[in-house]
Every structure is written in structure tokens, then in C-alpha cells.
Amino acid sequence: LYVSGMLLSMQPVVDIHNTKIQDGLMPEDLKGIQTESKRDGVQIVNQIKEFLNARDIPLDKQNLMLASFSEISKDAQRDEKTQLDKEVAKLIDGEASTNKQIFTFIYHNIFLSIDAMAGHLDIMGEMYSEFLKYALGDGKEIGIVLTPPYITKMMATILDVNQDSKVMDLATGSAGFLISAMEMMIQDAENTFGKKTTSAEDKIHIIKTKQLLGVELNAEMYTLAATNMILRGDGSSNIQKGNTFRTPEELYTHFKADKLLLNPPFSYEENGMPFIAFGLDKMEKGGLAAIIIQDS
């Protein structure tokens, strides 16, 4: 969550029309001031709040994400100036807070390099997915299984996901399935209408806002999933925080999924089989599903 939040705070603040409102946070903005409103961690969280608000992300979603990102500012001691770690000694003059040191390392070693490349958000998203893979491993220790990207892409391909698909994942995790599906849907739209054309951009907007549905119970995983989508230029994806089996019925009847991508949590009863039955029941007639089933 530290890296996720810091990456978001570095992004330029833009509105729903992609008009820049203010610059993203930079290392020199973190001054190690100890007053409560100016602490480095508080500055980072406040910048995240500005970013989410400018993108017109629903308030309830903002609050859920900010509750997770508040870990960055929770410990005031991490905002006190301290001796520099050797990894940032050449990047900072004098002492700096732990939060600033982490921020500075990410800024110089990741953000600036990616920001200089074309397709900034897509590359940032790929890097973020790689970070999640190494940070969370296979997720078994916390009862969460994160599906490798090559598997999510293979399963989306098997289902022949295209620009008109309505794709659902009831155990979203870090949104790996939805990301793979979204990429295929966007590619299909660009092949049909031409890259960067008005028709393609209009269709891509519909794909991102109307054709992807994810549900995730774990608050931190929900935040990671939402951040994953945002870093790909999608702040309006329909990822819901909640219990799959207790979400309103109209969520599924209104969405009308015709593709189900699912890796149910193995720690759930019957190795997650209720997720499979529930997901198949909520699909449109003639829909297709690709599901990973636990082997024990």
C-alpha cells in the first residue's frame, strides 16, 4: 500500500476530461515539517485525496481507498528526520524522514524513468502489476491467490473476450483478470475503429465504465485493485467492495455478464466452490466461464 499510494501521489492531478489541475507530488515537496497538517505522510495522503477527487471517483470508493492509504500517515515517527539510507544518500541532502526516503527512491528509480516513456500510464500499470506479484507472492499466507498475468491473459483469450463482452470477476484480488480482459477489449476496439479515433476512444470509455465488474471483500486488496485500474487511466471501473454473496441482486441483473473469469479463494468453504456456482448463476444465458479450480 505504501508503494501504491506513493505512485498515485506522484501522478499529475487531472479531471475527468484529462485536463491537468496541478502537478503530482515531488520529493522536494516533502520538507519534514512536524506540524500535523504538514507531515510528509499527511502530505502524501492529501495528494492522493486530491487525485481521486479530481477524477470524480465516487465518495464511498474514495473513502475506502483512503482508509487503506492512511497507513502512510498513521505513524508520525516515520515523518521525523533521520539518517539517510545508503540507497538514497546521493539523492537527498542532509537528513530526511523515512517516508520521504521511500518516496524519493520510488520517484527517481521508477516514476521518472517511466514518465519519460511513451504510454506513461500503461507502462506504470505494468510495473505496478510486477510489484504486486513480488510484494504479495502467491498470496497463500493471507488466503488470497493472485493469478499470474500469463494465466489471466490465456483464460481471457480462451473465452474470446472482445470489445462487446461484459466481463465479471467475483473474487477480484488485484484485478488481474479484469486488466487482461480490458486490454483485449481495448485492442479489439482499436482494431475495429482505428487507434486514437473518436469512435475508438468512445468505445474504450464504455468498456472501462460499463463492461467490467469486479467484487472484492478484502479492503486492502480492493484498494490495490482500484489503484491497478487507475494507473491504466481507468478511475471509474466498476469494482465493488463487498461480500460477493451479499451484494444487491440488481448489481448482477443490471450488468448482464456474458464472460466470467474466476480464481475463487481456496480458503473459502469447499475450496471456493460456492463462488463458482454463484458466478455461473449470475451470468446471461449462453455466457462462457473460465475458472481455476483448486486441486485439493
Regions found by a protein language model. Name each.
Residues Y2-M6, D122, E126, Y150, ...:
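Amphipathic alpha-helical interaction segments
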